[in-house]
């Protein structure tokens, strides 16, 4: 029927819920799971996971104890204790998303994080705000917070909090971090993403579970822009004062 789901050749399913118009095919192992409408699963492993509407999971992707929301596209790689908001994209084998919250996120090859500092155990977490992109082999040691639509390049060990600087490019070789505010706002990739997200909505329901707001200029983001501008203005004033006193 129009709203039926299809299950073909899966390996193991136990204690789960499968919504309407779901297709599950291939080497799938899943226990204690919820899979919502319009989702495609192929060759993946899920343990204690929620998968929202319109998601695509395949290529040997594995996840446990994670929430995966609408229109996420996950192939290869893995997620552990992760909150993967709408349009989270991870397409590479060596990618690990762990102990953090992500949304409208793009993980480059080899992107990973650590949510423990060995002696203390896995007690830390972090936040990549909407639209963050990670370059290949980027690494973040939690706790940390990255502002919306920023780009990470390198390895970050000093727990940055750049929430007040959206649209920034952050670079680090493991030591001090360099931040270039308001750079990605002019990148063609940012505007391309903004335009393509509504076109890649796989949900067919007229009343989908997730209410997605695609607007780029949202009040929360503009408030961060305002806070960042004030912080830079204060720093500029102090620098000018120190130079004038010399």
Task: Briefly describe each language-model feature range.
Residues 9-10:
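Long, structured ligand/cofactor-binding scaffold of large enzymes
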Residues 5-6, 23, 40, 246:
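Glycine-rich beta-solenoid repeat tracts in large extracellular/virion proteins
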Residues 239-246:
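Single conserved hydrophobic/aromatic residue that forms the stacking wall/gate
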Residues 1, 24-31, 36-233:
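Glycine-rich hexapeptide-repeat left-handed beta-helix
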């Amino acid at each position: 029927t129009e709203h039926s789901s299809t299950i073909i050749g899966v390996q193991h399913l136990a204690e789960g819920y499968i919504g309407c118009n779901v297709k599950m095919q291939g080497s799938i192992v899943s226990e204690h799971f919820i899979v919502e409408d319009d989702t495609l699963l192929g060759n993946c492993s899920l343990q204690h996971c929620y998968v929202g509407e319109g998601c695509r999971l395949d290529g040997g992707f594995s996840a446990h104890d994670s929430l995966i929301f609408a229109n996420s596209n996950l192939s290869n790689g893995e997620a552990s204790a992760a909150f993967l908001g709408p349009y989270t994209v991870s397409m590479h084998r060596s990618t690990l998303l762990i102990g953090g919250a992500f949304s409208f996120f793009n993980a480059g090859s080899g992107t990973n994080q650590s949510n423990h500092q060995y002696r203390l155990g896995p007690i830390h977490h972090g936040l990549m705000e909407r639209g963050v992109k990670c370059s290949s082999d980027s690494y973040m040691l939690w706790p940390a917070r990255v502002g919306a639509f920023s780009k990470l390049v390198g390895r970050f060990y000093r727990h940055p909090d750049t929430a007040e600087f959206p649209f920034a490019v952050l670079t680090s070789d493991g030591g001090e971090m360099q931040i270039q505010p308001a750079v990605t706002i002019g990148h063609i990739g940012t505007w391309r993403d903004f335009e393509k997200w509504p076109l890649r909505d796989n949900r067919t329901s007229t009343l989908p579970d997730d209410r997605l707001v695609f607007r780029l200029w949202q009040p929360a983001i503009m408030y961060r822009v305002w806070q960042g501008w004030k912080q830079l203005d204060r720093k500029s004033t102090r620098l000018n004062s120190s130079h004038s006193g010399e």
